[in-house]
Amino acid sequence: DGTLADTEMDGHRPAFNLAFKELDLPFVWDEALYNRLLAIPGGLRRVKLHAETCGVHLSQNQLDQVRDRKRVHYLERVRQGHVHLRPGVKRLLQELNRAGVQQWIVTSSGSASVMALLEQIQKQIPSFDGVVTSDDVASGKPAPDGYRLALERSGANSAASLAIEDSAAGLSAARAAGLRCLLTPSPWDADALSESGGGAAAVLNHLGDPGQPATVLSGASCQEGAVTLKYLESLLSVPDR
């Protein structure tokens, strides 16, 4: 869901901070710290490892409480409209929908978080053909389980499918499932992810909109600075690497 909207800095980070405060935990995640923590896949794993670096041991019960309270605050922030679509998302999804292209969400977030986001943005974008969340698989990204399940449910051929991702973990998951991948790193860690985009068919800072053109960080040039169906189709013919 971070590929669709800036869910991390505007949604998950402040929700974690509210949960920490409620539970009297001595953590405050500012943007710089959270940016570094994003290298760790999985929200609770992030909390656990950060606590350990601070010399704080959290029991499983405490971690469960953080998860539950954070989820409440995240859902509330989404419903209040604090989380916004990234550039080009609405335009591209509408184009793909008109062309009859199957569109699936594959995310490491839980079902409740994803459905709250979709409920908030449903008037702006077309419906997706399916959703695979962390609740549906044994292992989240960078494991390929989610993408493999989406391919199975959709009946799509991996050679004719393409993933659009925002993280190194997502890129690894897509590649392990046999998919080519367009990487659009989060604006908060674009420098780090552009360094790790070696397995991506292309790396752009976002999908691009009129007046807000995308910048190609690696890969094929993008006409008029906007990712289109034609551009995505061209990435399917990029030699695998």
Question: Where do the language-model regions lie?
Answer:
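Conserved phosphate-coupling serine/threonine residues in phosphotransfer and NTP-handling enzymes
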Residues: T3, T107-S109
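Short, surface-exposed alpha-helical segments at coil->helix boundaries
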Residues: D10-P14, L44, S111, M115
